[in-house]
Amino acid sequence: MATITFDSLNPVTVAISAGFLLLLIIFVKSRTGSSKRKPPGPPGWPIFGNMFDLGDLPHQTLYKLKSKYGPIVWLQLGSINTMVVQNAVSAAELFKKHDVPFCDRKVPDTLTAFNFNQGSLGMNTYGGHWRVLRRLCSMEFLVNKRMNETTDLRRRIEDNMVRWIEEDSLASKAQGGTGAVQLSRFLFLMAFNLVGNLMLSRDLMDNKDPEGREFFDCMNEILELAGTPNIADFLPLLKKLDPLGMKKRMVDNMSRTMKISSKFVQERLDNRKAGKINEKKDFLDVMLEYQGDGKDGPDKFTEQHVNIVIMEMFFAGSETTSISIEWGFTELLRNPHAFKKVREEIDRVVGVNRMVEETDMENLPYLQAVVKETLRLHPALPMLLPRNTMEDTEYMGYLIPKGTQVFVNAWAIGRDPEYWQDPLSFKPERFINSSVEYKGQHFELIPFGSGRRICVGFPLAHRVVHLTLATLVQAFDWDLGAGVKPQDIDLEERLGLTLRKKNPLNVIPKKRVHI
């Protein structure tokens, strides 16, 4: 009988075995001790826990688990303690009474490339640097006065989108096609150019700007990587190995993106030295001019900080906004009675001799209801961004250990039959004469989150989603294609960094308002 000695073992085998043994010890420890005071949840596998139990659409799986385990569900994702909040009462408790201890972020490994998380607003540790960025965004960039100054800019970019849609449809017909356009592409380009103008005062998707197109391509790669599940996030011992190569790919794409954004920054610095100052400040100006007081946060932003914020604003502002618009327009096409009501309201208030403006929105209550209903059913971030507990915390009768990852399932909360009648149906009328808003104070509707880390960009998203939906309804009649009925339009989801339509909306536009 052969004798197995330690010397006969392959070093790699030994390392892997030791690693799995350590993970097993961590898993067993996580299942003992104070487990009686943790929320209920499904049993998991050794080492991996519930990693493979949630499927491709975890927000839907967790929604179904609520009936068995209640509104607070405990998961073990590899070695990561995870809590999921799934109703308005528990969300209110978290945001109103425990916002600070739950205010940190759990950061995916890919977003630590170039220390992205340390310069980011959305993924930064709760502290001085985050507070400075938050203050600059909310008081210097996204305050009403600033946004009112860029109203004409947004209308121009919307008009460009209308022109692109019409030109693409005509080109399709000229080549023997149906004239159908993939709407999501134009919505993303519109949002991308909008962020480009607000951040850098330039159209990045101009045909004369090849660097803008390369920047666009890199940003799409970053979005895909940031939204792809990574085993290293659940088994942190694997982070240095980067087993799926995702960190390396993220470094490559961020490197290319930063080289381009550095050119934009240097160009601005050169112009400022030459006395060429923008008449209206964009966010790059705000960041370059920032001087801290040395008490809270940095005294000034480094070039890397500036580049990180530029990247973040593009993928946060472009992706979430365009997705929300596509979901809203999909629901309008699936529900012709709702489309008709929006069209009639716009024609009554605006007419057909000019395009709808942001100032018209207060007189379009049904459109406002459509946006609320869209965000209720289709939040762009279905479980918001992951939080991280900064200390052991007593919450809803449970002891939540420090370092626990916390998700709030806004998708499930928006479909909770305890708060919403006929919750799975698209009924904008439910918001007519209703005081419920999505500004973080009504916890049955929190697509942008709540508390200190509520999405800082929601005031801008609010304006753009309303204006774009109104523009699409006003500017075009829409044909679904031969034999396609409204009820044939599917609502299948695909989850990456955000919740997209699995099958992009393809429709045939016919110009209605010629202005």
Swiss-Prot record:
PROSITE patterns: CYTOCHROME_P450. It is an enzyme of class 1 (oxidoreductase). GO terms for cellular component: endoplasmic reticulum; endoplasmic reticulum membrane. It comes from the Eukaryota. Belongs to the cytochrome P450 family. Signal peptide: none annotated. Heme binds at residue 455. Its main location: endoplasmic reticulum. This is Iridoid oxidase. It is found in: Endoplasmic reticulum membrane. One of its GO terms (molecular function) is monooxygenase activity. The gene is IO. Component of the seco-iridoid and derivatives monoterpenoid indole alkaloids (MIAs, e.g. vincristine, quinine, and strychnine) biosynthesis pathway. Catalyzes the conversion of cis-trans-nepetalactol (iridodial) into 7-deoxyloganetic acid. Also converts iridotrial into 7-deoxyloganetic acid. Its EC number is 1.14.14.161. The chain crosses the membrane at residues 8-28, 180-200. Pathway: Alkaloid biosynthesis. GO terms for biological process: indole alkaloid metabolic process; response to jasmonic acid. Expressed in the leaf internal phloem-associated parenchyma (IPAP) inside the mesophyll. It is a multi-pass membrane protein. It catalyses: (+)-cis-trans-nepetalactol + 3 reduced [NADPH--hemoprotein reductase] + 3 O2 = 7-deoxyloganetate + 3 oxidized [NADPH--hemoprotein reductase] + 4 H2O + 4 H(+). Keywords: Alkaloid metabolism, Endoplasmic reticulum, Heme, Iron, Membrane, Metal-binding, Monooxygenase, Oxidoreductase, Transmembrane, Transmembrane helix. InterPro entries: Cyt_P450 (IPR001128), Cyt_P450_CS (IPR017972), Cyt_P450_E_grp-I (IPR002401), Cyt_P450_sf (IPR036396). Gene3D superfamilies: Cytochrome P450. The keyword Cell membrane does not apply. Induction: By jasmonic acid (MeJA).
